[in-house]
Each structure stands twice: as structure tokens, then as C-alpha cells.
């Protein structure tokens, strides 16, 4: 049925991705050899083919493509707990590395490897009954996930124009920087994602650190803890595809409900309940509690504060046995109480869906996906750092040396600034200013604000 093809690229993407597969295997009762060992077969196996192919001998193989320009991360996945579950041919890697250089990932090293990746993608897509879309895990600060990741997305876009393209993109953090050239890599990537992706879930390490530190009370969070948060959200977004629920959603329904204008498809995500290990027993999980926490700005997995902007749209995905009526009441309640944080020219702009099966170890849980104009803070911050370096042409020789042109940087910069301006325009728009926005969104959005 409605299959999703999962692709992970670069070190960050592969680490998030392998954590995601651990979570999904756990939810569906698949052990590390790919065999089913769960307890509720009818629920866990009914729609297992969203993420798995069934191989001979009753083994379930993830529909995943793993790519990287150096073998390191792949080797550690292979030797990790779920390393044997993946199809060996689906590991595609080079030896050279992209050295945190977007141009290497997009134009030189990545371009050499891309055909091998596309062959595997085609093979997996041909095995599907009715492919729904692709989900890509990558970071935007490095070279492989950002450069080669966006190259792959644009190639897939060419070949499968009518399939959904969902990305989980880790943005550079405001205070924590891994690489000096992050602003370049991120800006060049956003330039691609605006055009070629349908939905982007925006994540960043700093916000995830804050959640681990403040909410989960972990004194020294590891990347594993951060990736666990991300994978909880990833599994939440697709849970109503994988389990029977009362109010279903799929990638396309999500997009239709969340994207009022085609370029504004960068979402904030959150998850509830997040509790520290010690305090779990003192917390009663009720729909109001979940709702309260999932709309909390401290819960957002990217460094933008939803209180600084307004929600164009949002989607709440609840999991567990609960009354749909109560869910609807709570969502309505949030909208009425905080009406100033929602744009008034899209009435009822929160979609909810309910799925019966909660995540492992919880009675109920909720995943939040919001399209808020405050996401522009992320872009604005990266853009300022980009401009500071680009004005002096710092580090540019690494990119031009791989055959890039300065013009491409200028274009990416202005595209990102246009995006910020568009978000700002709709943040300021009110329901009664009809005359001003007759400009059709189809032109590339370069009008003055």
C-alpha cells in the first residue's frame, strides 16, 4: 500500500536515520535480525509495508537507502545493534568525503556517486505497490547531507514529480557551531529545498540540547539522546499511516493542510510527553496535559520562538486510546485562548488526527507540526552570518575551486531573504486588507513587502 522510501545522507542523516529505524522496529515488533517477534500481530503487521519490504523467510527489510561520501558512519551502522537488518546493496558510499563543502557534495564528489544512489532508489521504488513519497534525513551545515542531499532531492523531483518529498533537515544552531562554513552550506541548501521539497521539518541541535537539558534533566546529553527526540517525532508524523486510526493522515494530507503558499513549507515540530526519567510517575497523561505541552514554545525542536510570530497552520497527531471529541475540544480551546498567535484569515487552521497505538512505553503521546511565521528567525540568523562572510568573500575559494560561481551564492542569498520577507508579509497580513495581496503567488515571490 502507501509506501514511504526513506533516504539518509551524510553523518548526521545516517545517525538520525539509524535511530529512527530502531524506534520503528520497536513499534512494529521487528527484532534486529528482521524477524517479527511482537505480540499484537494484527496491528503491528497490518500496514508494515509502509516502511518495510517482506523478504523470503518472513524477514522484514527496511525500505531505506543509506548514502555518504565516506565509509565511517556506514561502518558503525553496520556494526551497530540493527546493522544486519538493512539490505547490503542499499549502502552507497564513496571514499573521499565532502569535507564540509557543499560544492563537493553537490557538484563534484557527490555528482560522481549520485547515479549509484539513484539506481538503488529506483530499485526500491519499483518494488513499491503505490509509492507515496520519500523522506530524507540530512543536515544542512555539512557537505554531504546538504550538498549531495539536495542534489538527490532535485534528481528525485525530476524523476518522480508527483510524489511527496518530506525532509528532516538539521539546521546549524545559533550558538553551537561545528564548522565555520555552515552559513554557506545552509543557505545554498535552503535555496534548493524551497524549490524541490514539499515539506521540511526544521530541527536544530541547540533546541534539542535545551529540551534534553531543561525538560529531560539530562546533564550531558549525547547525540544519541538528541536523535532519539527526532526519531520520536519522525515516527509520530507517520504513525497514522502505519497503524489503523480513527482520523488518518498521510504525507499529502499533511501538506494540503499545512501549506497555504507553496514556498512556505518549513515546519516546526514538537513532541509530548517529554518528562525526565525520575518524574514520570508523578505525571498523569491526559489530553489537556499533552495539548498544553505540545504547544509549549520550549518544546519546539528548532531555535525559533513561535510567540514571536503567528501560526499559519498547524497539525496535531495524537496517539493512544482517547476520545476524539476531547481532542477536538482541546484543539479548539487552544485556538480560542491564543487567537492572537494564529492568523485570522485562515479559520480553523489546526488539523488533528488520532491513531490508536501509542509509542512503546507510553499510554498516549502527541506530535506537533506547525507552520509558523517565526521560523523566519532561523533563516534570518543564517542569512546574517552568510552576508558577514560573503561580503568579504571569506572561504569562497573552497567553493569556486569546485567549479561554483559567485552568482550562485548571490542567488541563494536573495532567495533566502525573499523567503524571510514572505513569512513577514503573512505575519503582518490581516483578514480585511483584501486589495493588497492580489499578486498571484506563482511569480517567484520577488515583490516588495
Curated annotation (Swiss-Prot):
Q: Where is the composition biased (Acidic residues)?
A: 430-449
Note, other:
There are nine genes coding for beta-tubulin.
Keyword Magnesium listed? The answer is: yes
Q: Which organism is this entry from? A: Arabidopsis thaliana (Mouse-ear cress)
- PROSITE patterns assigned: TUBULIN, TUBULIN_B_AUTOREG
Q: Which cofactor names does the annotation list?
A: Mg(2+)
Subunit comment for this entry?
Dimer of alpha and beta chains. A typical microtubule is a hollow water-filled tube with an outer diameter of 25 nm and an inner diameter of 15 nM. Alpha-beta heterodimers associate head-to-tail to form protofilaments running lengthwise along the microtubule wall with the beta-tubulin subunit facing the microtubule plus end conferring a structural polarity. Microtubules usually have 13 protofilaments but different protofilament numbers can be found in some organisms and specialized cells.
Gene giving rise to this polypeptide: TUBB5
Give GO terms: molecular function aspect only.
GTP binding; GTPase activity; metal ion binding; mRNA binding; structural constituent of cytoskeleton
Q: Per the record's keyword annotation, is Transmembrane included, yes or no?
A: no
Organism taxonomic ancestry:
Eukaryota, Viridiplantae, Streptophyta, Embryophyta, Tracheophyta
Q: What is this protein called?
A: Tubulin beta-5 chain
Quick one: where's region Disordered?
Answer: 427-449
Which Pfam family, just one, is annotated for this protein? Answer: Tubulin_C
Q: What does this protein do?
A: Tubulin is the major constituent of microtubules, a cylinder consisting of laterally associated linear protofilaments composed of alpha- and beta-tubulin heterodimers. Microtubules grow by the addition of GTP-tubulin dimers to the microtubule end, where a stabilizing cap forms. Below the cap, tubulin dimers are in GDP-bound state, owing to GTPase activity of alpha-tubulin.
